């Protein structure tokens, strides 16, 4: 019932009550009518209060949905959250929200069933292990791999409200890529939920926004402004996204300023962690994720076998800054990263200990550019610096170790990724991406005369041509690159949500730094097919 109809009914009730009251003055015998009139007046007062509450709630919902359209839909495909596709009519019930004590709650996410076939056995689930693609001489390079998985399904809840002129938001998102010690593919397939995002946000009308919690890194390119839930993710089915994609999800405290929806600036302090690779590790070294003093018990990245279950001992948070521009066409970003690395050589009965500290940095860019009347969206991003490895999909190491002093040495690294999404029809999106990640050589000779550092030319590849002896085949990744393409086809879109079917083909190539003997390489081709149901 509209407010206008309710108001007319109230006026009619008032007029009737007045008429009855006048009759009552003329005829004192109808005291029962006086009681009924009083009850009607109380009911009308309650109705007016209820109308005011409904109008306030509707106003809050309209304000939230109008000011931040991106926040009402967590999409997987780039740009879909920001614009309707040609020929599509959105249901008035989408997205479906409900209200509780002045708050607007919006559930989201998708349920997915995926099958994949790899030409090389990575021993991985839905996420590719880019830095561990089997080398050509290994048994895994001669075995294919089939997997089926529902673990990439995501569930989320967005909570919005207002306190005076301040908008309040909270968001939680989870998938099922966690793995308890008893998780397996044998019988029950009992995979555990995994936290992806959990944050709170205060948004002031002056353009200031404060975000705290676990979220996508500020280094991740956005689709619009510098807004949470507007990250520009590659649109495929690979759980590790694309080689060259810059991202983490981690604890952060971020402050953002919006200047008239044209320019945005942001600064963040985010959770640090150090990954390393070294052909020689000095004795008694502390502070690394494999050191005796490291905290253990949590598997950080279960689909990347290079990582241990320890945590590095960190000196300070990573410092990040970003400026975003939207001059009227496209979205453009400049971003920067500062990092701090530390380890320690422990003292012994005959030697003194010492602590080593060094810094890393990164400078990058991002862009999203629409063409062909917004039917074609082209994206490009890159990052260059020292010690930036863990911020990329390939998981290249941040640093190596000086064999003499034990000091961490941030590696020279670079990455780039580009791609496009073509909205061919209202039901069909076509996409393609390519990316490359590189880690520079930083080689030494150890005190014992052996190979040390990262990418040492003294590393022997003699065992890399023997399938049985491949366990002794070691080397440092020089670069990893990928090319991928696929599509998403919307089978249904309406008040019950939407159902999409997608296929993706991935080619990955892994190069090692040269050593003694023929340098091995690795490559893999992966084919995905998925069916997804997005919640309305």
Task: Provide a role label for each language-model segment.
Residues 2-20:
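Gram-negative bacterial Sec-dependent N-terminal signal peptides
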């Amino acid at each position: 019932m509209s407010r206008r109809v309710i108001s007319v009914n109230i006026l009619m009730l008032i007029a009737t009550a007045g008429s009855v009251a006048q009759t009552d003055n003329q005829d004192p015998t109808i005291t029962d009518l006086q009681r009924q009139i009083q009850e009607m007046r109380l009911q009308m007062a309650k109705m007016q209060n209820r109308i005011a509450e409904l109008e306030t709630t509707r106003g809050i919902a309209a304000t939230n949905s109008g000011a931040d359209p991106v926040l009402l839909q967590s999409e997987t495909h780039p740009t879909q959250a920001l614009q309707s596709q040609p020929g599509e009519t959105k249901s008035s019930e989408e997205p479906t929200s409900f209200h509780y004590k002045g708050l607007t709650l919006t559930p989201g996410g998708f349920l997915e069933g995926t099958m994949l076939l790899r030409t090389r056995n990575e021993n991985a689930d839905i996420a590719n292990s880019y830095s561990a693609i089997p080398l050509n001489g290994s048994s895994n390079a001669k075995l294919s791999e089939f997997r089926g998985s529902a673990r990439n399904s995501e569930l989320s809840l967005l909570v919005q409200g207002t306190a005076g002129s301040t908008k309040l938001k909270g968001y939680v998102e989870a998938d099922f890529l966690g793995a308890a010690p008893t998780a397996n593919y044998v019988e029950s397939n009992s995979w555990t939920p995994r936290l992806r995002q959990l944050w709170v946000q205060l948004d002031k009308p002056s353009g200031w926004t404060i975000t705290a919690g676990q979220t996508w890194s500020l280094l991740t390119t956005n689709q619009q402004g510098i807004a949470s839930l507007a990250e520009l993710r590659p649109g495929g089915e690979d759980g590790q996204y694309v080689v060259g994609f810059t991202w983490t999800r981690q604890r952060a405290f971020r402050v953002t300023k919006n200047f008239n929806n044209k320019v945005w600036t942001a600064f963040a302090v985010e959770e640090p962690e150090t990954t390393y690779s070294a052909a020689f590790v000095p004795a008694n070294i502390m502070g690394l994720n494999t050191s005796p003093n490291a905290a253990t018990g949590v598997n950080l990245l279960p689909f990347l076998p290079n990582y241990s279950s320890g945590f590095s001992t960190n000196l300070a948070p990573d410092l990040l800054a970003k400026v975003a521009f939207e001059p009227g066409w496209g979205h453009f970003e400049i971003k920067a990263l500062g990092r701090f690395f530390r380890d320690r050589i422990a003292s012994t009965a005959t030697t003194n200990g010492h602590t080593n500290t060094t810094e890393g940095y990164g400078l990058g860019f991002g862009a999203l550019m629409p063409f062909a009347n917004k039917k074609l969206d082209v994206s490009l991003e890159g990052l260059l610096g020292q010690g930036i490895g863990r911020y990329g999909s390939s998981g290249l190491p941040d640093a190596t170790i000086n064999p003499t002093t034990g000091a961490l040495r941030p590696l020279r690294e670079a990455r780039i990724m580009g791609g496009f999404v073509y909205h061919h029809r209202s039901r069909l999106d076509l996409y393609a991406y390519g990316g490359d990640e590189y880690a520079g050589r930083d080689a030494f000779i150890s005190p014992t005369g052996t190979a040390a550092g990262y990418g040492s030319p003294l590393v022997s590849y003699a065992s890399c041509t023997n399938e049985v002896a491949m366990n002794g085949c070691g080397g440092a990744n020089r670069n990893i690159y990928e090319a991928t393409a696929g599509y998403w086809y919307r089978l249904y879109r309406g008040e019950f949500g939407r159902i999409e079917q997608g296929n993706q083909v991935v080619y990955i190539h892994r190069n090692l730094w040269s050593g003694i003997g023929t340098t091995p390489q690795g490559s893999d081709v992966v084919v995905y097919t998925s069916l997804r149901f997005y919640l309305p």
